[in-house]
């Protein structure tokens, strides 16, 4: 996938770093429909979370609803026609040893119009091992995350209280910090 190759180039990784099991034994697609809500302050389309996989490519649709956490506030992302949003997932945060962060986000509803979004997830194989790449670890920069099989990572992610994305990343952080 071209976007992963470009990420490698920008981060100083070999161009084929994400080729194979880590770049996806499969691609998952979620189509989300959010009907209008008479009182959007009382319900969310999706609660705050970080995506667990490598990257997410989101076609947000024309109606605003994606919000990202920034310095304690929620910032609404305005959809741009004919464009995608690329979210870095928790597994990419692990590979880069925290250089790239998975951003906490949520889907908000609105009272005026229904919203449709399409999310495509690059899903590493369950038996793939993900940990900080050696290019991001060295003297003065120890591994900040544990190396885990993706299947184990998913199980940990699924049992964590999804109300707190911080708990998700804490569970995979290395105890060396």
Give residue ranges: language-model regions:
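C-terminal flanking tails of non-heme Fe-dependent oxygenases
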Residues: 1-177
